[in-house]
A protein has these predicted regions:
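Class I Rossmann-like S-adenosyl-L-methionine
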Residues: 1-170
Length: 170
């Protein structure tokens, strides 16, 4: 039985080119040289062949990276391969689970949706990320706030109120 790669790619939620584009875009966003929406818009203008579905997936994943930058960046250090790829895979995994862009809002579904783009060893790595209990993370990592905001918050409210307040702001 011969597998039609084009048919498989047509049903895939994420494709290798999504990871490549996202890796480039996240690298640019992480510089914080310009507003994120401007960087994303400029990138899409430079890539006219990207379709609406591609743009939606890449944009959602890039903003997921920015929202959870602390957590994603910290876990990305544990992976192998280019950092941009690791950041892109984690961002895609998050949106497949949390934003309804995947087949189901579960880690198992997200892994299936990413099966077309992951290399050997990356599935287990993404599973470890999906199995992390958020409560086990350090407070700064859990709330994904920049350190200067977390410190300012700690200076202005009682310590026992910092975490609940920061989580409410997300």
């Amino acid at each position: 039985m011969r597998i039609d790669q084009k048919a498989v790619a047509a049903r895939a939620k994420a494709l290798p080119q999504h990871v490549e584009h996202l890796s480039v875009l996240i690298t640019e966003l992480a510089r914080f040289a310009h507003p994120a929406d401007m960087v994303v818009s400029r990138y899409f203008r430079s890539q006219p062949k990207l379709g609406n579905r591609d743009r939606a997936l890449i944009a959602e994943a890039s903003f997921a990276f920015l929202r959870r930058k602390t957590e994603i960046s910290q876990f990305a250090e544990s992976g192998q391969g280019p950092l941009g790829r690791r950041l892109a895979l984690l961002s895609l995994f998050i949106i497949m689970v949390e934003s309804g862009l995947g087949s189901g809002n579960r880690a198992e579904s997200a892994l299936a949706d990413l099966a077309f783009v992951v290399h050997p060893g990356e599935i287990e790595w993404l599973q470890r990320f999906g199995n992390i209990e958020r409560e086990s993370l350090a407070p700064l990592t859990r709330v994904n706030l920049p350190e200067w905001i977390w410190n300012a918050l700690g200076a202005s409210v009682p310590k026992d109120e910092c975490l609940p307040l920061a989580e409410a702001m997300l």
